[in-house]
Amino acid sequence: MATVAPPADQATDLLQKLSLDSPAKASEIPEPNKKTAVYQYGGVDVHGQVPSYDRSLTPMLPSDAADPSVCYVPNPYNPYQYYNVYGSGQEWTDYPAYTNPEGVDMNSGIYGENGTVVYPQGYGYAAYPYSPATSPAPQLGGEGQLYGAQQYQYPNYFPNSGPYASSVATPTQPDLSANKPAGVKTLPADSNNVASAAGITKGSNGSAPVKPTNQATLNTSSNLYGMGAPGGGLAAGYQDPRYAYEGYYAPVPWHDGSKYSDVQRPVSGSGVASSYSKSSTVPSSRNQNYRSNSHYTSVHQPSSVTGYGTAQGYYNRMYQNKLYGQYGSTGRSALGYGSSGYDSRTNGRGWAATDNKYRSWGRGNSYYYGNENNVDGLNELNRGPRAKGTKNQKGNLDDSLEVKEQTGESNVTEVGEADNTCVVPDREQYNKEDFPVDYANAMFFIIKSYSEDDVHKSIKYNVWASTPNGNKKLAAAYQEAQQKAGGCPIFLFFSVNASGQFVGLAEMTGPVDFNTNVEYWQQDKWTGSFPLKWHIVKDVPNSLLKHITLENNENKPVTNSRDTQEVKLEQGLKIVKIFKEHSSKTCILDDFSFYEVRQKTILEKKAKQTQKQVSEEKVTDEKKESATAESASKESPAAVQTSSDVKVAENGSVAKPVTGDVVANGC
């Protein structure tokens, strides 16, 4: 049996082995720096010991890991979003909400096929492998292929190796002249002519309301959002400029560039606030150029480090989108940047739809232009200028004249001349107080028009033409109404497609003439016509009629009807009563002069198109005649007499006629 040492001896032995003195260090280098980093995370050493870590070390900055003399090639694949904490793009409609506080130039491009979200590198400035002069912790090289707003892709850019030269003078960005099409008027870049926040003057009187910008005055310090020093707060009444009016994040405060119309936005060195307009003004005018886009694909364009350069527009009211321009509206391609993200040109057209009220729903997104195959050259408007909230006739004529300028037409009709020549119907003959609303027998139909241009012609000439099936349906209804004793009027409720309203009520006063075509309509596809008389001309919103359902149309609201949809007597009388009692402040008569100018433009274009077709047909006929004569001259000189049984050969001998099985040898 082993002898056990007494407890006193054990304690003495332990005290001899223990030592409270710290071992001498070989050098002043901290212990963590001596350790190998191969198995630093999750690994163990050969003895099975878990390595210890010193959490008091200073974290390594990107500038410590990046050698300024080495070229860092950008990664062609976009990594996962890791700026989510700071409000970077997490949705299709998001942009990073923060910008580099030193005011480094922003990018103005989109990422290519590999990108799944909008991913500008850093906090709002372009991908750049070198450190700006004022950045204490610069970002590393760009990690995604950045493409510009063109229809082609730029190749990768490989910058020259070498440190960033802060002593290089920043060139002053010159003013660029706008590429203005011929005949297009441009608002002068004069601050005195900028409209106030209450409205913009239009014509001689009246004002069109605009959306206020609520842009507060920014702090003049070099930091962002007015917080130059730690603890700095925002001014009273300040609205976060990172959010645009459409709910999208903006990489820089939303600003107004109307004072710099059609020129490049200047960049000054007085601070961030000097790059933005401090007044509440209307959005920028058309055809505004910002700067050359030569810095795509990780190329940083030199600019002032104390002020922001401007970026090309993406979303409406975020950067001042151009109504039309060289590169179209790039960022509007379904809010995704895949194969459809490069120069979408607004579904193949160079005009962007900035006002949904003037969009031709289902017929293109342009403001004045629609289908290029349309002979008229003007798209179909579902609502006229009165939708802007002004009833100034002279202002409407200005809009009409602008249409002709945009389409390349000569400005022949002046405002004064149009006032004298335009014949607006007398308003007293419509919306009469004694118009009856109760009928024992009556028939009602819904009429859907493609545009208000055709409704204008109908009121002007008291005529209408429907589709072939619609004309047959109305013709049968008119014959049936004529056979009823005591009379049976046929009322037509007119509505324009996608307008959200009805424009009036008319009565059919004659049969359909299938053999008479009128040349009034915007398109030449309508055949036949019938006379009518307008009783009520006013704008009646659909919201007043949605409660009326039609049993003969699957109990759908009357506002969801097709052309020549019949309405029963009970529902029809309710609609007539609503039409009469509704007090409307606008009607199509307010835009009558506007549509008069459009009608003249359409007729001129039709005449030119017809003349062009006639000249082309004439040239084609002349070419055919010359080709026939040339082919006849190339034929053999032998003359063949077909009206006789005697054939004259080239040598003058006579060939006897062939009879039966006898062969004529011509001897």
UniProtKB/Swiss-Prot annotation:
Residues 442-579 form the YTH domain. It is found in: Cytoplasm; Nucleus. It holds the Pfam family YTH. Disruption phenotype: Aberrant trichome branching with an increase in number of spikes. The double mutant plants ect2 and ect3 exhibit delayed timing of leaf formation and altered leaf morphology. Residues 267-285, 628-639 have a biased composition (Low complexity). Keywords: Cytoplasm, Nucleus, RNA-binding. CDD domains: YTH. GO terms for cellular component: cytoplasm; cytosol; nucleus. Residues 614-627 have a biased composition (Basic and acidic residues). Residues 264-305, 379-398, 606-667 are annotated as: Disordered. InterPro entries: YTH_domain, YTH_prot. GO terms for molecular function: mRNA binding. Residues 286-305 have a biased composition (Polar residues). Gene3D superfamilies: ph1033 like domains (3.10.590.10). Expressed in the shoot apex, at the sites of leaf formation, and in emerging leaves. Highly expressed in rapidly developing tissues. RNA binds at K448, S449, Y450, D454, W464, A465, N497, W521, W526, W534. The keyword Metal-binding does not apply. Interacts (via C-terminus) with CIPK1. Specifically recognizes and binds N6-methyladenosine (m6A)-containing RNAs, and regulates mRNA stability. M6A is a modification present at internal sites of mRNAs and some non-coding RNAs and plays a role in mRNA stability and processing. Binds preferentially in the 3'UTRs of target genes. May play dual roles in regulating 3'UTR processing in the nucleus and facilitating mRNA stability in the cytoplasm. Required for the correct timing of leaf formation and normal leaf morphology. Functions redundantly with ECT3. Required for proper trichome branching and morphology. This is YTH domain-containing protein ECT2. The lineage of its organism: Eukaryota, Viridiplantae, Streptophyta, Embryophyta, Tracheophyta. The gene is ECT2.
